[in-house]
């Protein structure tokens, strides 16, 4: 019972960190562009997180049980590794994929315990992690090219429509993060009403108290994005994460979105994109996974 409470507490802490940190990914653009206020953005993010968790969170059940034995001892180690890695990355101001750290540590712990995870699932995860960024870049690039070659006749009316669509895209991004990343955490913890309630509370706490400093436009740090570009990047990445959720594969929202931002930037030949932040993120994707695996294996 005591170990269960410790595990749930660690799960709550990780949920708080994930919710607050990833709010910039889902609603940072609409808040930063002043389409809506911060608190409205927080409300959209919270509603999206919780809706995704409740409606599709169970989709990650097999992945959670196949990657890590259902032992509160092992689960608590995986969660502790992820929390520690996140705190260190925050102090170093380095981007980090919590999803990849958590998956990597789960695999490392399983192998250390003498259990080989489902190889078919591992291949599917690796394939999705490679294919998703490539597809996100391609979709964003081609979609923006089409819009550039076929500019709207009524610019103001289109801008208003794009603002509304961008809000929808932000909600959908929050929804897929709740279904995938938070759903994976829910199933690692074993699910149930107690765990679900604790996670919902964690979502609210993280979104309200940890989002103020991180609601930044991810796209604007790499590229000055238009409404259309931001909408396409958000929708393409969210759709890919939704597909991964349906397939039962944990996938990082920031991974897909960062790739989508690059695709949008590459579509504009007259404006250069700063590729260094994206290359840094790609490097941390790889490091995050292997760091999680290494720590999970040796602990």
Annotate each predicted stretch with a short phrase:
Residues 1-299:
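Multi-pass alpha-helical transmembrane bundle typical of ion/small-solute transporters
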